[in-house]
From Swiss-Prot:
Note: When the channel is activated, one or more imidazole moieties of His-37 probably become bi-protonated.
A GO CC annotation given for this chain: virion membrane
Protein name per UniProt: Matrix protein 2
Site (Essential for channel activity, possibly by being protonated during channel activation, and by forming the channel gate and the selective filter): 37
Lineage: Viruses, Riboviria, Orthornavirae, Negarnaviricota, Polyploviricotina
Any Pfam family hit: Flu_M2
Positions in the Virion surface compartment: 1-22
Amino acid sequence: MSLLTEVETPTRNGWECSCSDSSDPLVIAASIIGILHFILWILDRLFFKCIYRRLKYGLKRGPSTEGVPKSMREEYRQEQQNAVDVDDGHFVNIELE
């Protein structure tokens, strides 16, 4: 007699889910949390660029201009704007064959 014949295999009834029609509050809460988690994950994947860009750059402010004369504020703003502006002549056209 081999060991395989001695091992009990569960019947089909043993594998059934006991929580499929359960009204247990813990099961209901877990289901709701799982569904909400899935919805939030989908939204995160769809809008992650907007969300993380807002968190990274949207909450930061520039340096304080308190006590700085208005002319210096305007000069600083102009320097920052010039640093952001891009000259169109610096673009390179690459053509693929």
